[in-house]
Regions:
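N-terminal leader/targeting and assembly helices and adjacent pre-domain segments
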Residues: 1-134, 138-145
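Acidic, glycine-rich two-metal-ion catalytic cores of nucleic acid-processing enzymes
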Residues: 128-197
């Protein structure tokens, strides 16, 4: 819930900034003119989600800890931090890239008309805030958790993929479960190294 609200806050701030830009500028023809370069754009989302993603990754690391003595929160945090780049990349592919693609299409569709572009931007951000965030944020949280769990695995640890028979159907999860016990750092049959499938 918190991650969803944080993401929606970034989207709202970003939309307001874009609309201000469109009111006070010459014709906008490039994506960078309204949201900045991709790396800069991605940092806004990664920064907003970082505390929640770190907590999810640490929880994942804690879930697969198998030695007799529970490591300190610091040790778990250090292990999970090794996955932060991969988690950030998932945020980019889940939110930033699709959003940039939609905005880029809107710029092309507006053909230099800032008023038309403003209308299209409102539609894009409304869709993201009302629909896409809710569809995307759970996968991001699950991926952070899964990456945290992956961080504490060693190549000699045996792991099995389990799926919830009462949960939604997932062919990849079922295929992965058929592989049985595998070395902890090996990819499952579908290519996944961690949940979710």
């Amino acid at each position: 819930l918190t991650m969803g609200r944080k993401t929606k806050r970034v989207l709202a701030d970003e939309q307001n900034q874009i609309l201000d830009t469109l009111r006070g500028r010459a014709v906008v023809k490039t994506l960078d003119a309204i949201v900045g370069p991709k790396a800069e754009h991605a940092k806004r989302y990664s920064a907003a989600l970082a505390p929640s993603l770190k907590s999810a990754a640490v929880a994942g690391a804690r879930s697969l800890h198998t030695t007799g003595v529970m490591p300190s929160d610091r040790e778990l945090s250090d292990a999970a931090a090794k996955q932060s780049k991969a988690i950030d990349e998932f945020v980019v592919t889940s939110i930033v890239e699709p959003l940039r693609e939609r905005l880029s299409r809107s710029i092309s569709q507006a053909s230099g008309d800032n008023a038309e572009l403003a209308k299209l931007v409102r539609v894009v951000y409304r869709e993201w805030k009302n629909q896409m965030v809710d569809e995307t944020i759970d996968d991001i949280a699950y991926t952070a958790y899964g990456r945290g769990a992956l961080a504490v695995l060693t190549p000699d640890m045996k792991v099995c993929w389990k799926f919830d028979p009462a949960g939604p159907a997932c062919a990849d999860a079922e295929d992965n479960s058929l592989a049985g016990a595998m070395n902890g750092c090996d990819a499952f049959p579908t290519g996944h190294t961690h949940a979710p499938a």
